[in-house]
A protein has these predicted regions:
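Hydrophobic faces of well-ordered beta-strands that scaffold small-molecule active sites
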Residues: 3-7, 39-41, 76-79, 107-111, ...
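Short, acidic/polar
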Residues: 18-31, 92-95, 182-195, 243-257
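Conserved, mostly hydrophobic/aromatic
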Residues: 31, 43, 68, 99, ...
């Protein structure tokens, strides 16, 4: 099983705006140093209110990943996950392309239907009903795939119309950067995973729930003739638990790996993210042995 580090907290004691960049840089370097496979961040204008407050600091995700790309060499980079409403899909595909080029082929598109209504209303970003957000999500996936292909023609959807899908330079990864869809909605989200995605990200509530979601995804794959084994199953976990009880954490991961999970993202990396990441280093080889 692989490890990913999810950087979601910009509120650290004594860290003002002028020190956020250096701290992010050192955390990313530490993550790569311990053997993390992924480095991800959130895609929000405001900090999540279930985690802190809307007035706590939050940096724009893709700008931040471009910064991280310049100081790392190996880790895959993406947002967990991009809200489909935040950027026009043509622009989003161009942003991912740029990140892929500048990182020498390490970008992936993590995307979902968006949910944080307050930040949309605050900054004047349209926030349609859930049904329409899922329609826009599917069209965005189609547009991204077209822009990462040789097809430079038009795109005509119910919500988005593009006259030309020119995208130069092309992405480094072939045939395209991986697409990850976040969430475990059984009727729509997991169906879109089966149709369009290379990976999904599930919340690690418990092994039974994750196992059920995976079985639903398998059924969607069977219905459309998709090879389920092509899809990378990832999940979110908690770094504090992993550090405090590594043996218990690894036992949990063995159960998830048996279900098909191949990467765990550890979030909530605390007031000293560099130290928190380094504390995870002994887990990495033991985690890698699971499912090997």
């Amino acid at each position: 099983m692989q490890l990913g580090i999810h950087y979601m907290n910009f509120t650290q004691p004594g860290i003002g705006p002028e020190k956020m960049g250096p701290l992010l840089r050192e955390t990313a370097i530490a993550a790569e140093g311990i053997g993390s496979s992924w480095f991800t961040m959130m895609d929000h204008y405001f900090q999540m209110e279930q985690f802190a407050t809307a007035h706590d600091p939050m940096l724009e995700g893709y700008t931040s990943l471009g910064f991280v790309a310049a100081v790392t060499k190996r880790m895959q980079l993406g947002l967990m996950v991009t809200g489909v409403t935040y950027r026009h899909p043509g622009l989003l595909a161009k942003i991912i392309t740029t990140l892929d080029v500048l990182s020498e082929g390490r970008a992936f598109l993590g995307i979902g239907a968006a949910w944080y209504e307050r930040e949309h209303q605050a900054l004047g970003v349209p926030y349609p009903e859930l049904k329409e957000r899922f329609e826009r999500l599917e069209e965005t996936l189609q547009i991204a795939q077209q822009m990462w292909s040789d097809d430079e023609g038009s795109y005509a959807g119910a919500h988005y119309q593009l006259a030309e899908t020119i995208n130069v330079p092309a992405v480094v990864q072939k045939p395209r950067p991986p697409i990850l869809i976040g969430g475990g909605g059984e009727k729509k989200t997991l169906r879109l995973v089966a149709q369009y995605a290379d990976a999904c990200n599930l919340f690690a509530s418990d092994a039974a729930t994750v196992g059920h979601k995976i079985e639903v995804l398998k059924r969607h794959c069977d219905e459309i003739g998709r090879d389920f084994s092509e899809i990378k199953i990832t999940m979110m976990g908690a770094a504090p638990k992993a550090a405090a009880d590594p043996d218990g954490f690894l036992r949990d991961m063995e159960a998830y790996a048996a279900l098909g999970v191949s990467l765990v993202e550890l979030a909530n990396i605390g007031p000293d993210p560099v130290a928190a990441v380094r504390q995870l280093e002994p887990l990495v080889p033991r985690l890698a042995a699971i499912g090997a």
